[in-house]
Amino acid sequence: MDCSLVRTLVHRYCAGEENWVDSRTIYVGHREPPPGAEAYIPQRYPDNRIVSSKYTFWNFIPKNLFEQFRRVANFYFLIIFLVQLIIDTPTSPVTSGLPLFFVITVTAIKQGYEDWLRHKADNAMNQCPVHFIQHGKLVRKQSRKLRVGDIVMVKEDETFPCDLIFLSSNRGDGTCHVTTASLDGESSHKTHYAVQDTKGFHTEEDIGGLHATIECEQPQPDLYKFVGRINVYSDLNDPVVRPLGSENLLLRGATLKNTEKIFGVAIYTGMETKMALNYQSKSQKRSAVEKSMNAFLIVYLCILISKALINTVLKYMWQSEPFRDEPWYNQKTESERQRNLFLKAFTDFLAFMVLFNYIIPVSMYVTVEMQKFLGSYFITWDEDMFDEETGEGPLVNTSDLNEELGQVEYIFTDKTGTLTENNMEFKECCIEGHVYVPHVICNGQVLPESSGIDMIDSSPSVNGREREELFFRALCLCHTVQVKDDDSVDGPRKSPDGGKSCVYISSSPDEVALVEGVQRLGFTYLRLKDNYMEILNRENHIERFELLEILSFDSVRRRMSVIVKSATGEIYLFCKGADSSIFPRVIEGKVDQIRARVERNAVEGLRTLCVAYKRLIQEEYEGICKLLQAAKVALQDREKKLAEAYEQIEKDLTLLGATAVEDRLQEKAADTIEALQKAGIKVWVLTGDKMETAAATCYACKLFRRNTQLLELTTKRIEEQSLHDVLFELSKTVLRHSGSLTRDNLSGLSADMQDYGLIIDGAALSLIMKPREDGSSGNYRELFLEICRSCSAVLCCRMAPLQKAQIVKLIKFSKEHPITLAIGDGANDVSMILEAHVGIGVIGKEGRQAARNSDYAIPKFKHLKKMLLVHGHFYYIRISELVQYFFYKNVCFIFPQFLYQFFCGFSQQTLYDTAYLTLYNISFTSLPILLYSLMEQHVGIDVLKRDPTLYRDVAKNALLRWRVFIYWTLLGLFDALVFFFGAYFVFENTTVTSNGQIFGNWTFGTLVFTVMVFTVTLKLALDTHYWTWINHFVIWGSLLFYVVFSLLWGGVIWPFLNYQRMYYVFIQMLSSGPAWLAIVLLVTISLLPDVLKKVLCRQLWPTATERVQTKSQCLSVEQSTIFMLSQTSSSLSF
């Protein structure tokens, strides 16, 4: 065996620094490496077919049935249906089988149609033509036939067919522009960079002769992360190793823009592409309503088992006497007498289970799903939540949490881009204590933008002038801003000046503002060409700097750096970042003066950044290059190694100055927060900004008020006192004024709570969350939570993304288990959005990662007010009524059946006809509650927006508490007693018909069923406050349908029925005067307690919502009276 092959296998399967199991090797163009390299081992990867469908023609039926019967309710009814088939039961298998068949069939048709559409889309994608290089020539084939290692050519406006490593383009600088709108919703153009050693290959022959291998990580779904390296082989020399990152990766689904063509090598194909891996849905979130519904279901299941058990025991007690067990007309056979008693009892128990199984509402699950699915469209159709400026409307990524929007107790919000506009404007810069402002009014005149002015000392020293220019050069060079000459380019952009057509583009609005601001002060960034950055200085001379390295920004370091080389050969490292990140790394500069200015600007709500630098000698730079290269080419723990390298490089800096950028508060952000607080919701701001800046924003948006007493839990205070002492001191402060915490205080819904505000920073939070050797961490957390519960607002500053999620999780799993909502607009907010019960993304300027990973997305923060106070309120009211109503009407349905067993010797005789058993939940009572759960508005939309306190009436799952559930259950039992015994007393009078005949068993059951259908439907009509023609049509139409169906079902001889026990029954019942009287009287008696309860509660213990309803009705009557009087006076005047 070849030694190189053995060496490769040993490296691959033995442990070492690089874990080869977690990486793959790809041979570019399927070409074997030159002699001396590692042996060529062909590897098997999936083809490029995308399969987003779940089913095939062969497995649809078994797989779909398996998935549907995994649901507990469907499986339960399947068992009931099988019991009906196996043993002799009182009801036909049709009564359970038909509703189950209907539910399963409707769901299967819906899922099958959706899967058919996915098949069509997959086929269209898999069969689209793709150009690839084979033996130096351009060949065309279908996308599905692409393999890993193929070299592909993509033209402008074409979509990348798989995940590609960018090798070259027609551009001389080896760049290309892409849009990823179909992946993450971002329409801005992103720049990607070709591999340095392949960007000169512009023809098919050149690229076809490339000898290279790529080593990269195994497929993973993160769109913004990629780790790999490329080995480019030459004929004589050792391979050149270059790192590969996300900037070199072109993702499937992205589109090539403003570039004629590119060449790339396929590394991930088919279902291993990042787009395909992102098909997987997020973890399922369950709402409080769903949890309550499952708890109620368990209660009713226990009631069902109890009923069956009681009836089984009573049956055998009743039949203990021989003449009852074997009446003369129903003698048992010998085999029946010899059957095992326990087997007979178990069979009877199952028969009673079948008889009473309708107490579990199978159709409730279908109705709830339809209500959530259809209800989500009301959010997306809401014109009030459409933002004309961005052209965006609300998005619903999941409809399972609509009602959870009405239960929120804590809101965790990001600051930048969520509360603020993320539209940055450069305000000033401070250089060694000298302040420069672009727009200044001097002697009544506005100075030219390019001049600027030193607000403290207009004539700094010669050395100061050098530092000033170095500071401006640092701002011109330390960024990732691009300059485009095409005005049609999308994305955040700024024109350098009004007379030029070029635009600045960056994923960070801060960088655009800084580059634009320094341009007004005399230094203009021109472009990046052939790895040289060009700037125009104050003397209108172009300066060129070679870009050697970029140390990219990340939210943990909170800074970025560049290493550049000037035309004179001097090498500089320029670094900019947060003051907390820069100051500890500074050894020289006027730190105290700049720190004072930074703190002053922060208090005014401005965003601040500090700028520092250091000169590097050639030997230092070469050492940095080796350090960075080793970290960049690592396949395992690359991010960790890069972070360690950055720590070693970004130190011993000289402080140059600081900048101040204004980020204005969003429109109506303050009004929204004020309304949310009135609704009893606690609002926390979680931000990475410094404390002073964030606090100023909190005051501006009315989170903190002038009379709010601020409590600080920051690193600075903890340095002066121990963490234990600080926590106990704050705890005593808040408890001294607020007293013992009540249950409402804990939930954040007390209006009388002392107005405290807490400020905590990331370092202090780390100390609180950090486990201690003595196990005291838990005590610290409890103390911290106790303090937070007593504060009306909390500000968490200097937060890393994972710390935001930690805060949300801490509150989410506290002992009160409040419902949490997280809202943000950037990638650093995704972790807390996924952690919260409800995650909302703001469709902002920092991309769409937050919107993609959220449950809902809105254009602006102000739309959160209507999302919660209106939509959330309505959906909670609607679905709560739906759940309670379903259980109520099924108690009404099945309890008379239970009572009937005491009058038929526990013989399992059914009270209702098979057709009524089957259609009760499917047809007779289903549509009214569905329309109610979609249309009901117990108060007007304007009232809910105007009076946020109404939100408190439905907080903490108020309408699905056990007290309310028991009331609905008892109401159902009372109505069932009225139905049964009212009809029973009517039947005691034998003169119920004109000819003296008495009613039979089926007429008795039909009378009970008729009263029941009318009662439960009219009960819903009484609960309806918002009437439309659709409600009228469905409610009265359902009653009419029942009457017409009963007339046809009993008035026609149906040939497919073996026996027709309902023939002429309904018509005979309607021919009886007492039956008509009984229906009217029993319906009235059944509805009376609920009506009296509502009237008394409204008068004696009205809720805020009921007071508003009463006031609205009075105003409506008053306005109608005034209108009638005005009309009368008008007619009399003539």
Swiss-Prot record:
Positions contributing to ATP binding: 414-416, 511, 553, 576, 607, 687-689, 798, 804, 828-829
InterPro entries: ATPase_P-typ_cyto_dom_N, ATPase_P-typ_P_site, ATPase_P-typ_TM_dom_sf, ATPase_P-typ_transduc_dom_A_sf, HAD-like_sf, HAD_sf, P-type_ATPase_IV, P-type_ATPase_N
Any one GO cellular component localisation term in the record: recycling endosome
Regulation (activators, inhibitors): The flippase activity is inactivated by caspase-mediated cleavage in apoptotic cells, allowing for PS exposure on the cell surface and engulfment of apoptotic cells by macrophages. The ATPase activity is up-regulated by aminophospholipids PS and PE and down-regulated by increasing intracellular Ca2+ levels.
Transmembrane stretches, start-end: 62-82, 89-110, 297-318, 350-372, 882-902, 915-934, 965-986, 1001-1023, 1030-1050, 1069-1093
Segments in the Extracellular topological domain: 83-88, 319-349, 903-914, 987-1000, 1051-1068
The entry's keywords: ATP-binding, Cell membrane, Deafness, Disease variant, Endoplasmic reticulum, Endosome, Leukodystrophy, Lipid transport, Magnesium, Membrane, Metal-binding, Neuropathy, Non-syndromic deafness, Nucleotide-binding, Phosphoprotein, Translocase, Transmembrane, Transmembrane helix, Transport
Modifications after synthesis and translation: Proteolytically cleaved by CASP3.
Topology with respect to the bilayer: Multi-pass membrane protein
Major localization listed first in the record, in broad terms: membrane
Disease: Deafness, autosomal dominant, 84: A form of non-syndromic, sensorineural hearing loss. Sensorineural hearing loss results from damage to the neural receptors of the inner ear, the nerve pathways to the brain, or the area of the brain that receives sound information. DFNA84 is characterized by slowly progressive, postlingual hearing loss. Leukodystrophy, hypomyelinating, 24: An autosomal dominant disorder characterized by global developmental delay apparent in infancy, impaired intellectual development, and loss of developmental milestones and ambulation. Brain imaging shows non-progressive severe cerebral atrophy, ventriculomegaly, hypomyelinating leukodystrophy, and thinning of the corpus callosum.
Family (UniProt): Belongs to the cation transport ATPase (P-type) (TC 3.A.3) family. Type IV subfamily.
Name under which the protein is recorded: Phospholipid-transporting ATPase IH
